[in-house]
A protein has these predicted regions:
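Acidic catalytic loop of the alpha/beta-hydrolase fold
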Residues: 174-178
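Short glycine-enriched nucleophile-adjacent loop
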Residues: 51-62, 68
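Conserved acidic catalytic loop of the alpha/beta-hydrolase fold
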Residues: 24-42
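Catalytic active-site module of serine/aspartate enzymes centered on a nucleophile-bearing elbow/loop
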Residues: 193-235
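Flexible "cap/lid" loop of the alpha/beta hydrolase fold
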Residues: 67-98
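Conserved alpha/beta-hydrolase catalytic His-Asp/Glu region
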Residues: 101-144
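Active-site nucleophile elbow and catalytic-triad environment of alpha/beta-hydrolase enzymes
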Residues: 142-159
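Short beta-strand/loop motif that positions the catalytic acidic residue
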Residues: 163, 169-171
């Protein structure tokens, strides 16, 4: 079903939430992708909204997830993990890009604000990715529809409290898009979750942090991978 895209300003102000589209739909799409690829289960790593989707998959489809890694995400709880006032203002006043160059320049501007101030800013990389995103879809309908779906899903603290798979939560201490309290709340809500703060990291994945993040994920997923391999051998 192709629903009309919500008004982005109304979404940011707390209105125009299409109840027929939420994180549960995106989680179901994720499981559908696993089915299409022929995977019984997987190690899920989600970033930002992807973290919310991964959390929802782990909560609603526990048998399909080996481990969960949630990065720069939150629980949806009110006043927790929210954007900084300066970020809200930039999002609410941003004019939709009229062409590819405006989209690229806009991405550079926002990521200079929400990015990792503790690491060098790679403008070339941001421009490249923004161009790819524009070429894939030159409208903002998908973005605003997904953002509305996040708001419509509300507080998921109780739901993710039922997650039983090993969980790693990573969050930068300079995040202006999702305040670090979002990561703290996520780790507190999920039983036995491990929380790691990345000093100097904002709401992106700077190249300088990749090594540390990859090591954390590798260490986190290794035990579950060994258990699964052993079970398959015994079967």
């Amino acid at each position: 079903m192709d629903y009309p895209a919500p008004n982005p300003i109304a979404v940011l102000r707390g209105g125009n939430h299409p109840r027929q589209y939420h994180l549960g739909d995106m989680a179901r799409d994720t499981v559908g992708l696993l089915d299409a690829l022929g995977y019984r289960d997987a190690h899920l790593v989600g970033i930002s909204m992807g973290g919310m989707i991964a959390q929802t998959v782990a909560a609603q489809y526990p048998g399909r997830v080996r481990t969960l890694t949630s990065i720069m995400s939150n629980t949806g709880a009110p006043r927790i993990g929210r954007p900084a006032p300066s970020t809200w203002w930039r999002m609410a006043t941003a004019r939709p890009p009229r062409n590819r160059m405006e989209a690229i320049d806009g991405a550079v501007k926002i990521f200079k604000h929400i990015g990792s101030h503790g690491y060098p800013f790679d403008e070339g990389w941001v421009r490249e990715k923004a161009g790819v995103a524009w070429d894939r879809d030159p409208t903002s309908d998908g973005v605003t529809r997904q953002l509305a779906g996040v708001f419509a899903s509300g507080d998921r603290t109780a739901e993710i409290g039922a997650i039983e798979v090993p969980t790693l939560v990573i969050h930068g201490d300079r995040d202006r898009m999702v305040h670090p309290t979002g990561g703290v709340a996520t780790a507190r809500a999920i039983p036995r979750a491990k929380f790691v703060t990345m000093p100097g990291m904002g709401h992106d994945l700077p190249f300088g942090a990749w090594g540390r993040i990859l090591d954390l994920i590798a260490d986190h997923t290794a035990p579950a991978s060994v258990v699964t391999a052993t079970n398959q051998e015994q079967a």
